[in-house]
Amino acid sequence: MSQALRIVFAGTPEFAAEHLKALLDTPHRIVAVYTQPDRPAGRGQKLMPSAVKSLALEHGLPVMQPQSLRNAEAQAELAALRADLMVVVAYGLILPQAVLDIPRLGCINSHASLLPRWRGAAPIQRAVEAGDAESGVTVMQMEAGLDTGPMLLKVSTPISAADTGGSLHDRLAALGPKAVIEAIAGLAAGTLHGEIQDDALATYAHKLNKDEARLDWSRPAVELERQVRAFTPWPVCHTSLADAPLKVLGASLGQGSGAPGTILEASRDGLLVACGEGALRLTRLQLPGGKPLAFADLYNSRREQFAAGQVLGQ
């Protein structure tokens, strides 16, 4: 392997933690870990550390949690670490040019898409939602723009018709660390050079929010089926039946027509609902206060509740 580097790691969620875990198994020295401040989580809204912070503390690594890296004090603290390289994975803070210039080899980022497609916050879910045939991880040299830097390395994986946001996330979380380690070796040896992104091909992966997870039955069934997969396990698509919320965690394309949102049929195979085009069969649901269940299990005990002719989402 090439020379061991002094590395600062910056990341926050589980996807980033997988990268840190892999780097800890290399000869490189992690001199500090940057992550988002602890956030309230769960029913009790108790302050919880990020996945990256938890892993860093397990390994006795120094943890930094600045609110911003735009001020001179935070930048001086980073410079004092004398890092050769900063590895950034889903950190959640914008890095100004002054920060990008601090490490000797700059900053690299592992981004969960095949750039320049799906720059931005939610590339995994947007790829599934759009019906893309493939996704992957791009390791890039960072610059001040959002995911615009020269591409150092790409690895790809097909997106199957069964993939969810969760399953694709897990696959990319396994691919990304290997790509980062390979890119670090190339940078250290001076053999890896970036490919400029074609901005004309860029698309933007807007951040997910709970409001957009409400199913719009006027849309084509093929789009809603992809949305259900993309938004599982979060934020989870939802609708309502007789004013009660209904979470939808599994669906498949069905046949039938009717006014959008109308229940066409309920059976052990699922709840068939008319859409703007075609029909969607809901196969996995979660009722208020309950756990996610296959519709077959709900049908056994609640078939009257799902009688045909009712309209969802009213």
Curated annotation (Swiss-Prot):
Protein's UniProt name: Methionyl-tRNA formyltransferase
Function: Attaches a formyl group to the free amino group of methionyl-tRNA(fMet). The formyl group appears to play a dual role in the initiator identity of N-formylmethionyl-tRNA by promoting its recognition by IF2 and preventing the misappropriation of this tRNA by the elongation apparatus.
Catalytic activity: L-methionyl-tRNA(fMet) + (6R)-10-formyltetrahydrofolate = N-formyl-L-methionyl-tRNA(fMet) + (6S)-5,6,7,8-tetrahydrofolate + H(+)
Transferase in keyword set: yes
Family affiliation: Belongs to the Fmt family.
Gene Ontology molecular function: methionyl-tRNA formyltransferase activity
Binding site for (6S)-5,6,7,8-tetrahydrofolate: S113, L114, L115, P116
Entry's EC annotation: 2.1.2.9
PROSITE patterns: GART
Pfam families from the UniProt entry: Formyl_trans_C, Formyl_trans_N
CDD domains: FMT_core_Met-tRNA-FMT_N (cd08646), Met_tRNA_FMT_C (cd08704)
Enzyme class: transferase
Assigned keywords, A-Z: Protein biosynthesis, Transferase
Domain of life: Bacteria
GO terms classed as biological process: conversion of methionyl-tRNA to N-formyl-methionyl-tRNA
InterPro entries on file: Fmt, Formyl_trans_C, Formyl_trans_C_sf, Formyl_transf_N, Formyl_transf_N_sf, Formyl_transferase-like_C_sf, GART_AS, Met-tRNA-FMT_C
One cellular component term from this protein's GO annotations in UniProt: cytosol
Organism listed in the record: Pseudomonas aeruginosa (strain ATCC 15692 / DSM 22644 / CIP 104116 / JCM 14847 / LMG 12228 / 1C / PRS 101 / PAO1)
